Amino acid sequence: MINQRLFEIDEWKIKTNTFNKEHTRLLESLTSLANGYMGVRGNFEEGYSGDSHQGTYIAGVWFPDKTRVGWWKNGYPEYFGKVINAMNFMGIGLYVDGEKIDLHQNPIELFEVELNMKEGILRRSAVVRIQDKTVRIRSERFLSLAVKELCAIHYEAECLTGDAVITLVPYLDGNVANEDSNYQEQFWQEEAKGADSHSGHLAAKTIENPFGTPRFTVLAAMANETEGFVHESFKTTEMYVENRYSYQTKASLKKFVIVTTSRDFREEELLSKAKELLADVVENGYEDAKRRHTDRWKERWAKADIEIKGDEELQQGIRYNIFQLFSTYYGGDARLNIGPKGFTGEKYGGAAYWDTEAYAVPMYLATAEPEVTKNLLLYRYHQLEAAKRNAAKLGMKGALYPMVTFTGDECHNEWEITFEEIHRNGAICYAIYNYINYTGDRNYMEEYGIDVLVAVSRFWADRVHFSKRKNKYMIHGVTGPNEYENNVNNNWYTNVIAAWTLEYTLQSLESISAEKRRHLDVQEVELEVWREIIQHMYYPFSEELQIFVQHDTFLDKDLQTVDELDPAERPLYQNWSWDKILRSNFIKQADVLQGIYLFNDRFTMEEKRRNFEFYEPMTVHESSLSPSVHAILAAELKLEKKALELYKRTARLDLDNYNHDTEEGLHITSMTGSWLAIVHGFAGMRTANETLSFAPFLPKEWDEYSFNINYRNRLINVTVDEKRVIFELVKGEPLHMNVYEEPVVLQGRCERRTPNE
C-alpha cells in the first residue's frame, strides 16, 4: 500500500515538481541533510510561515529536560536528555521591493526540489508571484563531508517581469525552541555576536541546569560572497545577526557557515577557530568546497552501494536509506552514537537506543572500516561506570545500560521501558560478539569487551530468581522487544539473551590474561552460579504447538491475526487505548523472531518455520525495526513473496511514510533493515563461527542485484542474477568461505549456479 509518496522514482535522486502545503513537514524530513557532525531539516532558506518544523541539530549537543510524569516512581531519571534545536544558520531572507517572499503566502507557479544522493546536495527552485511581479528562486546547499563544520549555500533570485529591487538577508538566528520541550522553555542564552559588511557570528550557550550535566556553547560564523549589489548593511539584535544586500532585478549569493562547539574547542577559541576554517573555505571558493564534498560521497558509495536491476522503486529506497545512515554516522567520533531520528527531528530525544547494537552494527561492519563500528562499541565501554550506577539505582549488581542516553545515565522516564526493557543489556553484549566474530579483533576483548561482559553478566545473575516450584531460573517483570506488552514474566527473548550473555562471558574469560582476570575480580564461586543459571534457565515452550512462547501467558490471550483487524484502526497506537493494546496479542515488532534472527545457527529450519508461521501473522509491524527481521527470516524460509513484501516496507518506510509519522523525522536506525534484508536475507550472508557464508537467491521481480562488503581487510563484490552468483575479490588476500554450504576458496573471481527452484 502506498501511503504518502511525495517524490518521483529515480535511482539516485528524490525529486518532485509538486509542493503540497499539507505535507511541508514530511518534505522537510525527507530532504534533511547531515554530515555526522550536524544536520538540518529540509527547511526553505527564505523561511515559511505555514506549518513547518525548523530544525538544526549539532551532534553531542543536548540538554537535560526535567522529567514530567504524573506519578513519580523511585528510580526514575530526573531528566530526559534531548538533542536540542540549535540556531538556524541556513536562513536567507528574500524581499522584492521591500516585501518578504513566503512560499506559504505567495502563489507558486513552479516548484522543484531535488536531493541528489550520489553527491549529497539539495537543490530547489521555485517561481512565485508577489504583487504584479514574478520571481524565480534557486538554491543549492550541502553540509560538507570534507570540512565537517561547514554548511555552504548558493542562493539566487531574479525578477522575471521587469525591474525590481531584490534584497537578500543571510542571517544567523538563535531564537529557536524545541517542540518537545516538557515545560516550553528556551534552552539557549546568548554569549556573543558581531557583524560587519560581509560576515557575522553568533554564539549561544545552553542555559544552566540543576542536574550537573555539561553545558554547551555553539558558535556559527558566516561569510557571504556576492557582487553586483547596490546597497549593503548589517545589524545585530538579541540572538540574531544579519547581513543585507540589495540588487537590481537579479541577485546571487554564496553563504558559507562554520559551526564550532565547546565539545571540540575551548570557549575562548570558538570564534578564532571558526574564522580560521572560514577563511580557508572562502579562499578556495564554493566550487572547490563542493568538489571535495562530492568526492567523499563518491568514496563512500564505492564501498557500500547496493545495485538492484529491475526495480527502480526499491533501488531508490535502499540508496536513500544508505545515504541517510552515512549522513548521520560514519564513525568519526567515539563520543557519538546513532539516534533513532538522527538529525531529522526531535522525537526520542536524539539519544542512543539499543537499535544501534542490534541493527546498525552488522551493517556498518560490512560497509565501512572496522574503526567505524569499534567507535560504536567504545561509546558503550566509556559509559560502563554510568551503567553500573543505573543498576545500583534499581538495587541491582553489575551494569544495566540505559534505554536512552547521552552520557550513560538513563534518560527514559516511562517505567515499563526504563525499569523493564532490560533485554537492551544483551544487545550491547551481542554487538561485542558480532564485532570480534566479524573482524577477528581479539584484542578488543582483552582491552574493553570483557569489562562490559562481566558487568552485564553480574546484572543478569542478580536479576534472575530461582523458582523452586519449577526448579528453573526465571526473569519476571520485563518488557520484551514487543513493546505492546509490558510487565510480563519470562519473556522468551529476554531469557535467551540473558543466558547467552552469561555463556559468552564464560567463554571469553578463558581467553583473557590472568592479570585482566584478577583486575575483574572474578571468582570461581561466581562463575559456578552463572553456569547454574545457564543450565537451568526457563524458556516458555508449547509442546502442543511446538513453538517458543513469547512469555508465560501469551497463549492465554484472545489470539487473532492481523488480517482480522479493520484497516481504519491501524496503526493501533494512534487508534486504540493503551489498555486495549496491552490486552491484545498483536505484536509491534519481532520478539521471539528477534532471538531466532540473532542466534540463527542454533535453531533448525523447522523451528524457524513453525515460529515464523505462528508469530508473523500476529505482527502489525508498527515499529520501524520490525519488517527487516521478518524479511530476513522469510527469505531464509524461501517465502519469497512475503520476504519481498516486507523488504518493500523496510526499504521505503520513510519515502512512502508507511507508519504515518515521518513528518516527525526519519527512522534512521531502522533504515539499516533495508541493507540487512538484502545481504542477510536475499543473499543469505552469515558469519557464524568466524566463517563467511552465502546462500543467495534472486527475487523473481528483479533482474539482478549486487553489493560490496568489507570483511577482514578484504573488499568483496557479490552479484546475483537468475542463474548464478558471482563473487569477486576486489581487494585483499584469498578467503576460505562457504557458498550454499559448500567450501570455496575465493581468489580473484568465483562463480556458482543458483539452485533451481
Swiss-Prot record:
Cross-referenced Pfam families: Glyco_hydro_65C, Glyco_hydro_65m, Glyco_hydro_65N
Catalytic activity of the protein: D-maltose + phosphate = beta-D-glucose 1-phosphate + D-glucose
Residues engaged in binding substrate: W354, D355, K588, Q589
Keyword terms, alphabetized: Carbohydrate metabolism, Glycosyltransferase, Transferase
E.C. number: 2.4.1.8
GO MF annotation, one: hydrolase activity, hydrolyzing O-glycosyl compounds
InterPro entries the UniProt entry points to: 6-hairpin_glycosidase_sf (IPR008928), 6hp_glycosidase-like_sf (IPR012341), Gal_mutarotase_sf_dom (IPR011013), Glyco_hydro_65_C (IPR005194), Glyco_hydro_65_M (IPR005195), Glyco_hydro_65_N (IPR005196), Glyco_hydro_65_N_sf (IPR037018), Malt_Pase/Glycosyl_Hdrlase (IPR017045)
Active site: E483
Record GO biological process: carbohydrate metabolic process; maltose catabolic process
The protein's enzyme class: transferase
Pathways per UniProt: Glycan degradation; maltose degradation
Role noted for this protein: Catalyzes the phosphorolysis of maltose, leading to the formation of glucose and glucose 1-P.
Family, per entry: Belongs to the glycosyl hydrolase 65 family.
NCBIfam families in the record: PRK13807.1
Protein name: Maltose phosphorylase
Organism taxonomic ancestry: Bacteria, Bacillati, Bacillota, Bacilli, Bacillales
